[in-house]
Structures are given as structure tokens and as C-alpha cells.
């Protein structure tokens, strides 16, 4: 966390006991020192004092918070400084926070202080020249109010919470301290920094215990003498906040304020009480961190208690060598002092596990409006009994630091950083194995005279084959030797010594050739373990293979990680379902909360189904996990292979994982695929129909109507009376809707729309002739909604110009026909196409236009086809539907008309 230092000076500012002596070692910043008329203004002196003190106490070896995310590493800590000073009737304040550069002798802050000091001295001289009346005209209350506003402006420039620690040093004059009514606004500004920014306030001065008692109590400030001014700022502090313990059973929270974490110098790490089954030498991390980007860490305001833990149950790979010191920023809080004593008394075998939330952001988050000075003033105006901090959401990656708190033996408390389950991965295990291999290499060479693992490994059959080949080679070598002795006319008899040397030499060359041709075999797993056990009988040497490090699978690091990760997920799920996040296990018992909707499989149960090689113990079968009160019992001796070859009748009575999705007797997958493809073709704006004000015409129906048979057999014909009743009901409902529409919406000119056409018939006013409107010029007409649509204004697709009322005279009828010939609407075009389809269908069944029953059959087939087509969900492929409907109903219509005609 970055550090922000604010120096506030009220009064004369003469501090000879501390700042003046320090100023002797620094540059001269006041031209009036040593004189009685000019004040010893020591803002620059105090700045030099603090700068030198902080620079001397900074140790680069002190522990800091490491990166807790793979997204990047935190940037280096920065220090900022600002000053607000009041002397007499003059005050000045820094306009912004200035960064402190410890590597330079003089920085920008010193120039600003020098300039303001000169202005202050000039203002004091002017005041001394003026008479007392003009000085009395100035009000100290206005001066302090102006100073308070400047402090509010500085507070508005602080970063988001969790990013900065604010330290305020208040220097008060020994003589004539200001009255409470005068400096009250400025104290309010400091209270703002104290409550909402967790600022640490220190009041320095002689006799401040008496003069500033009320201010110290109100601001919860520490009071120190001027001699201790150099020790006010602790550069080792890394975090300030409170310790928070939740009791989940009763929903009770206990908070202990005024805690801090300090960095300490790295010491030797003791693991005598840890589970050291796979403890290795600490691996030094890489110093090259430039490859990772810089990120910003925003730490939580509270250390949250998780649980008490026994160190022997904690795997050593979770322990880090990063330690901090837990301390108090203010020793006046008795509850916090008692808690610190209790934690410090924990022995080396037990510790308390806490978690510190942290949010990681790639960018610097701007100051939040919830903590602004304007919000503070509005909040204080309401006169709250207790001051609470507004909730501020810091967006970014959520992470956390786990800290194990224990006593360090000196009545102090140490906090050891614990790796979380998310930070333990394969890289850690790999580094652990390599570290053990490297540390034991030298010992292995010294403790064992030769390396058995480097020798070639053969099976029994390979040795027999090699010896047979060696015998053959030796026979050939002996024959070649005798042959050469014979050619050289030497005696063929060979002495024993010569024969022995020949066989030995032959064997040597053969084995060299054999080893060169056949490479050294890699040890198999079982042979490795056996060899490892043999080696352990002689010396505790670890072999060169990572698979030999742990012979007992129960002690593998991966298993500990898996179990801990599973426990971590369960704990996180409980935190999510509970009302209190990041809480510990219950202090007074377990609370029966709602059951989790997600069933988690315990790590031990999961590992039972796998061997030490990671292979399944048997054929893969779904695990019978009970997610409710009823247990899903699987059919015994059933596997995916057997299920695939079962017929549908047998598979429907089986119980198996996922079987409810694959009971397919009608090629459901193909049907669903086709239906999805059909739905994907629908166009949104073509699926609207019109809500017309005209009534629905009733076709003359005197006989049973055959049902539309596109996807069913043409034999199912409903009763004619039922169909007529349905049509009458539809007509009466449409008439009522037409009247309602006439009342709700005034008549106005309707504009032709490019949306879908309706297959409903339109009347032409007083005329008894029906203009049948059928949709689509292409198989691209759109879906028409049912006529029972709600009364909402939808653009009409009909052409009302052709449906306007006309007189019964020949002139108006002639004009109407002429207009239809000039411009044909879509519905008229569809009507014409349907009539043409009906005519062509009747011709196929020998009913031509010259036939006496052509008119009746044509009218009857047209009405039936239109009655079906009006209920289509989409007009895509309308022409094909017309032909299909006409062909399916043509035979019934012709038979019915011919039968009716013959009876006459």
C-alpha cells in the first residue's frame, strides 16, 4: 500500500526541542530563526526530519505482500506528502499530494515549502505594520474553515480504499492554543480522514495531554512529545485495519480495530512441527519479474477469521517463508490488546488462520464518489449516532491472502503467509521434485560407489538370447583362428591360455557391439520401485526419477492438493449460501442452512475409483449421485455399448445415465433438426398479421368438410355442423372485435405494409361479393398470427383501397375492377394462384371447365384449401402447400359434389 503523509501545523510552530536540532543538519529554510520578531516556521524542518527517518528505516529485505494473481505483480511502494499550516491570520495548504523521492537530496516538495514560508513571513510583516483594528476584522473561524475546505480537497484526491495508508501529524503551538469553536471545521475534516480513510492521527507537542485532550479523544489520536516526532511514522507497516470474527449461528460479528501488519526481515524458516512428508529445500524464486505487467492491489479493510488449525495437519507445501508481524496502531483499545495477547500465546503447534481479501486491477481505480467530502458533509448533516463507512465496490480480480497467526516467543505475534489452494498447481509440485533431486545429487554420488541405475537393464529372455549369440560368435572366432593358423602353416593345436584369451577378447568386443546396437533400456515402473527399495537398504539416496520420490500414493502432493481444493470449494459454497460472507466455522455450533443445490463429490470418494496410476479401477460407469430424496438406481450389468444395441422396447424400461434423452422411436433427432432449420428461416418482421376492422365472411357450407390433411391421412372428416358452429363463433368474435376497433381507433387512411398477408377474406362494404385474399407471390410469405390476437395497432398488409365501400352501380364496379387490374395486391395474387391451383388439380381428375360440376367442385375445393391455409404458421413454401392441400382433398370434394348432383 502507498503511504500518504499529511503535516498539519497550527499556531506559531516553534519546536526547538526536536525540529530545530534536526534542522541543523539540513538546509536553512527560515531566514528568521533566532530572532524574536520572526517565527521559527518549521514545516520544511519537519519534512526533512521525517524524510531522513523514513529513509533510514526502509529495509529492502523486509517482507512485503507478494503477487497473488498470475495477471501481474504489484508495483513498488510510493510515498506522498502534503502540508497544511496556519500561523496567525495566514494559512497555506498543498494543492495536491507530492511524491517523496528518497534518492534525491532536494525535491519539489522542498521548493514548495520554501516558497510558502517566504510568503508566510511576508504576510506576518504586513500584519505587524497594520493597526490592531484591521487585524481584529479578520475572523479565525473563517481561516480554519478555509483550511478545512483545503483538507477536504486533499481527501478527495486520495485513491480508492485499500490502496493507501494515511498518516496525519498535527503540530500544535505551546502558547495560546486555538479555541474549540474556531478550529471545529478543521477537526471535522480530519475526522473525515480518520473514519472513512482509516487515517492514523498523531498529535505532537509539549503539554499536549492537557491542551489537546478533547481533540485527541474525538480523533482517536496518539499524543507524543516533540522528541518522539522522528518515530511517529513506521515505514514497516504494510496494512492497517481490523480483525473480524463472525459467528454464523447467531449472525453476530465481533470486530477488533487498530491492527496492522508489518514487514519483517527474512529469517530461517522452522518447520519442525509441520507435516514434512514432501518438504524440500526452499526454492529461490526467479528475480526476473519484468516479464509480468504491473498491477494494483486493493486490500480489504479487515482480517477475517477462518478457523483454528493444527500445524501437523497442514502440508508443508502450503507454508511460505514470508512472515509479517501483527501489531497495534493504538494501544488504547483494550479489546484489541487482549486479542493480541491471546493470539501471541498460541504455541508453535497450533495457529489461527485468517484471510485478507484483495482485489487486483490492471488500471488505477479513480477515487470513489461515496467517500467524497460532499457525501461526508451530507452524512454529518443527518447527525448519525455512530459513523459508518459507506460500501465501496472495487472492481477487479478477487483474490486473498491466507495468514497463519502465532506467537513468536517474544510476546509478539507473527503472521506466516499460507499458499491458497488456487496457488498450488503443477508448477509447484514440479519445482518441489526438482529441488529435492538437486539437493540430493552430491550425496548420492558420495554415498554410493557406483550407479546401478546407469547399468543396462535386460529381461531374462534377452540375456539368454545374448548368451546364445555370444556362443555362436565365439565358435566363429575359434574357427577363423584355426583357419588362419592352418594357412600360416602353424600347428592347429591351441593352448589353454591362447584359447582363454581368444574367448575373453571375443566376448569383450561382442558386448561392446551389443551395447552400442541396443540402447540402455528405461526402467519400468515396478522395476524402478524394486530397485529403489534395494537402494534404500544401503543408503538413503533418492533416485533420479520424479516418479520414485513418493512410493506411497497417499503421500503424493497432488492428493493433498486435491483434497484441500475440494474442501476449499465446499467452504466457498457455504460462504456463498450463508448470509455472512468470508466467515469462519461456527464458534458455538453448526448452523443448519439451506441445502446446496450443487452436489459436491468428496475427494476421498473420488479417489476410490482410480488406481495409483491415475487409471480407473474398472469400466467407466456413471457415479450414482443422489441429488434428492429419491435415489436413481441404475440397471445392473448395463454399459453404454450394451445400451446402444438394445431395441427401443427394452431400452425404455432400463435405468441408465442419460437414457431419458435418447429414447427415440420416431427419429426425434432428425425431426428436431428439421424443425430447428425451419424455425431459423422465420423472419421476425414477417411473422406479424393484421388486425382488420372488417368482419370475417362465412363461406356457404352445407356439407361435411374434409379436414386439412397435410401431415395426416385424408380419411378423418369432422362433422359439418361442428365446423359450421366453429365458423359462426369465429365470425361473431371478429364482429365484436371490429366494433371495438372502430371505437378505440378512429378511421384513418391505412398504408400498405411490407409485412405478411392474411388469408382471411375481405368484404367490400355493401357488396355480397367476396374478394378472397391469399398470401404470397413466392414461398417467402410470412407467418400470419391467429385472428384472436390482442387489440394492438399492427400495420395492415391488406390494401384497403380495394376494400372500400362502393355503390351498387356499374360505374363504381367498373372503377374497382380497373383499379384491381392496374395494381394487384398480394392477397389478391394469392387468391388467384390458389384458384389456378384448384383448376389444375380438378383437371388432373378429369373435371375441366366444361364439366357441369366444375363450378361447384372449384368453389368447394377452394374454400377447403383456403380454410386450411389460413392456419399456417409460416408462408414459406406456400405454393407447395396449396398444391398439396388441393390434391389431398380433391377426391373427397369431387365424390361429394357428384353424389349430391346425382341425388337431384
UniProtKB/Swiss-Prot annotation:
Keywords assigned: Cell cycle, Growth arrest, Phosphoprotein, Ubl conjugation pathway
GO CC, one annotated term: chromatin
Modified residues (Phosphoserine): 597, 639, 703, 707
Compositional bias (Basic and acidic residues): 812-830
Entry's Gene Ontology BP terms: negative regulation of cell population proliferation; negative regulation of mitotic nuclear division; protein localization to kinetochore; regulation of protein ubiquitination; traversing start control point of mitotic cell cycle
Domain of life: Eukaryota
Keyword Metal-binding appears in the UniProt entry: no
Annotated segments matching region Interaction with MDM2: 521-904
Pfam short name (any one): MTBP_mid
InterPro entries linked to this entry: MTBP, MTBP_C, MTBP_central, MTBP_N
Annotated region (Disordered), positions in chain: 19-38, 754-784, 800-830
Family: Belongs to the MTBP family.
Annotated function: Inhibits cell migration in vitro and suppresses the invasive behavior of tumor cells. May play a role in MDM2-dependent p53/TP53 homeostasis in unstressed cells. Inhibits autoubiquitination of MDM2, thereby enhancing MDM2 stability. This promotes MDM2-mediated ubiquitination of p53/TP53 and its subsequent degradation.
Assembly mode: Interacts with MDM2.
Protein name: Mdm2-binding protein
Species, as recorded: Homo sapiens
Lineage: Eukaryota, Metazoa, Chordata, Craniata, Vertebrata
Gene: MTBP
Amino acid at each position: 500500500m502507498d503511504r500518504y503523509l499529511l503535516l498539519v501545523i497550527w499556531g506559531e510552530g516553534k519546536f526547538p526541542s526536536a525540529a530545530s536540532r534536526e534542522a541543523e543538519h539540513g538546509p536553512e529554510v527560515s531566514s528568521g530563526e533566532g530572532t524574536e520578531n520572526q517565527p521559527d516556521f518549521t514545516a520544511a524542518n519537519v519534512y526533512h526530519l521525517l524524510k531522513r527517518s523514513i529513509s533510514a528505516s526502509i529495509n529492502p529485505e523486509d517482507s512485503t505482500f507478494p503477487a497473488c494473481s498470475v495477471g501481474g505483480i504489484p508495483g513498488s511502494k510510493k510515498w506522498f506528502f502534503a502540508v497544511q499550516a496556519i500561523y496567525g491570520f495566514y494559512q497555506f495548504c498543498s494543492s495536491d499530494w507530492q511524491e517523496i523521492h528518497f534518492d534525491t537530496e532536494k525535491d519539489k516538495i522542498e521548493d514548495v515549502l520554501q516558497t510558502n514560508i517566504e510568503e508566510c513571513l511576508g504576510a506576518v510583516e504586513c500584519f505587524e505594520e497594520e493597526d490592531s483594528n484591521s487585524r481584529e476584522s479578520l475572523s479565525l473561524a473563517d481561516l480554519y474553515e478555509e483550511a478545512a475546505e483545503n483538507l477536504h480537497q486533499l481527501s478527495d484526491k486520495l485513491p480508492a480504499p485499500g490502496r493507501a495508508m494515511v498518516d496525519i501529524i498535527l503540530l500544535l503551538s505551546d502558547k495560546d492554543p486555538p479555541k474549540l469553536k474556531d478550529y471545529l471545521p478543521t477537526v471535522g475534516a480530519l475526522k473525515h480522514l480518520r473514519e472513512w480513510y482509516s487515517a492514523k492521527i498523531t498529535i505532537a507537542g509539549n503539554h499536549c495531554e492537557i491542551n489537546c485532550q478533547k481533540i485527541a479523544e474525538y480523533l482517536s489520536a496518539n499524543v507524543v512529545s516533540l522528541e518522539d516526532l522522528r518515530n511517529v511514522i513506521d515505514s514497516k507497516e504494510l496494512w492497517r485495519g481490523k480483525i473480524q470474527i463472525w459467528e454464523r449461528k447467531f449472525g453476530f460479528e465481533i470486530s477488533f480495530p487498530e491492527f496492522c501488519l508489518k514487514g519483517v526481515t527474512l529469517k530461517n524458516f522452522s518447520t519442525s512441527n509441520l507435516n514434512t512428508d514432501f518438504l524440500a529445500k526452499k526454492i529461490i524464486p526467479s528475480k526476473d519479474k519484468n516479464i509480468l505487467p504491473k498491477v494494483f492491489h486493493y486490500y480489504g479493510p479487515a482480517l477475517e477469521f477462518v478457523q483454528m488449525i493444527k500445524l501437523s495437519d497442514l502440508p508443508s507445501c502450503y507454508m511460505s517463508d514470508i512472515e509479517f508481524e501483527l501489531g497495534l496502531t493504538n494501544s488504547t483499545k483494550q479489546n484489541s490488546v487482549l486479542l493480541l495477547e491471546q493470539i501471541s500465546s498460541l504455541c508453535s503447534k497450533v495457529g489461527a488462520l485468517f484471510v485478507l481479501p484483495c482485489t487486483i486491477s490492471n488500471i488505477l481505480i479513480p477515487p470513489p464518489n461515496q467517500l467524497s467530502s460532499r457525501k461526508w458533509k451530507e452524512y454529518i448533516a443527518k447527525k448519525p449516532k455512530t459513523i459508518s463507512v459507506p460500501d465501496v465496490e472495487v472492481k477487479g480480480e478477487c483474490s486473498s491472502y491466507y495468514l497463519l497467526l502465532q506467537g513468536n516467543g517474544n510476546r509478539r505475534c507473527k503472521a506466516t503467509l499460507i499458499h491458497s489452494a488456487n496457488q498450488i498447481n503443477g508448477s509447484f509440485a514440479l519445482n518441489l521434485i526438482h529441488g529435492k533431486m538437486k539437493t540430493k545429487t552430491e550425496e548420492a554420488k558420495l554415498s554410493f560407489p557406483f550407479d546401478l541405475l546407469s547399468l543396462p537393464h535386460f529381461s531374462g529372455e534377452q540375456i539368454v538370447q545374448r548368451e546364445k549369440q555370444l556362443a555362436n560368435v565365439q565358435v566363429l572366432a575359434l574357427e577363423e583362428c584355426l583357419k588362419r593358423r592352418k594357412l600360416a602353416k602353424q600347428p592347429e593345436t591351441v593352448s589353454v591360455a591362447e584359447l582363454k584369451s581368444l574367448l575373453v577378447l571375443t566376448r569383450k568386443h561382442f558386448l561392446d557391439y551389443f551395447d552400442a546396437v541396443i540402447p540402455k533400456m528405461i526402467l519400468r515402473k515396478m522395476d524402478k520401485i524394486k530397485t529403489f527399495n534395494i537402494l534404500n537398504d544401503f543408503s538413503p539416496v533418492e533416485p533420479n526419477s520424479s516418479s520414485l520420490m513418493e512410493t506411497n500414493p497417499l503421500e503424493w502432493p497432488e492428493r493433498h492438493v486435491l483434497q484441500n481444493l475440494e474442501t476449499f470449494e465446499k467452504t466457498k459454497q457455504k460462504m456463498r449460501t450463508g448470509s455472512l460472507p468470508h466467515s469462519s466455522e461456527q464458534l458455538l455450533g453448526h448452523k443448519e442452512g439451506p441445502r446446496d443445490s450443487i452436489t459436491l463429490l468428496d475427494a476421498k470418494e473420488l479417489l476410490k475409483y482410480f488406481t495409483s496410476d491415475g487409471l480407473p479401477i474398472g469400466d467407466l460407469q456413471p457415479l450414482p449421485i443422489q441429488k434428492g430424496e429419491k435415489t436413481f438406481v441404475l440397471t445392473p450389468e448395463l454399459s453404454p455399448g450394451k445400451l446402444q444395441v438394445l431395441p427401443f422396447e427394452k431400452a425404455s424400461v432400463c435405468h441408465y445415465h442419460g437414457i431419458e434423452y435418447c429414447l427415440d422411436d420416431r427419429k426425434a433427432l432428425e425431426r428436431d433438426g428439421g424443425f430447428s432449420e425451419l424455425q431459423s428461416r422465420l423472419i421476425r418482421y414477417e411473422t406479424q398479421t393484421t388486425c382488420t376492422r372488417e368482419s370475417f365472411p362465412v363461406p356457404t357450407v352445407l356439407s361435411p368438410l374434409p379436414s386439412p390433411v397435410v401431415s395426416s391421412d385424408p380419411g378423418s372428416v369432422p362433422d359439418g355442423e361442428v365446423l359450421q358452429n366453429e365458423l359462426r363463433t369465429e365470425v361473431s368474435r371478429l364482429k365484436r372485435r371490429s366494433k371495438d376497433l372502430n371505437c378505440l381507433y378512429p378511421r384513418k387512411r391505412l398504408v400498405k405494409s411490407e409485412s405478411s398477408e392474411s388469408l382471411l377474406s375481405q368484404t367490400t362494404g355493401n357488396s355480397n361479393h367476396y374478394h378472397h385474399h391469399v398470401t404470397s407471390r413466392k414461398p417467402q410469405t410470412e407467418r400470419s398470427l391467429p385472428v384472436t390476437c390482442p387489440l394492438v395497432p399492427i400495420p395492415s398488409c391488406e390494401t384497403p383501397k380495394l376494400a372500400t365501400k362502393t355503390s351498387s352501380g356499374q360505374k363504381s364496379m367498373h372503377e374497382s375492377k380497373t383499379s384491381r387490374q392496374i395494381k394487384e395486391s398480394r392477397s389478391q395474387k394469392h387468391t388467384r394462384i390458389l384458384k389456378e391451383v384448384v383448376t389444375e388439380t380438378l383437371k388432373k381428375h378429369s373435371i375441366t371447365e366444361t364439366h357441369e360440376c366444375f363450378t361447384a367442385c372449384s368453389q368447394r375445393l377452394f374454400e377447403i384449401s383456403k380454410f386450411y391455409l389460413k392456419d399456417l404458421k409460416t408462408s414459406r413454401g406456400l405454393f407447395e402447400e396449396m398444391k398439396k392441400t388441393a390434391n389431398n382433398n380433391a377426391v373427397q370434394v369431387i365424390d361429394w359434389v357428384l353424389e349430391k348432383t346425382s341425388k337431384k
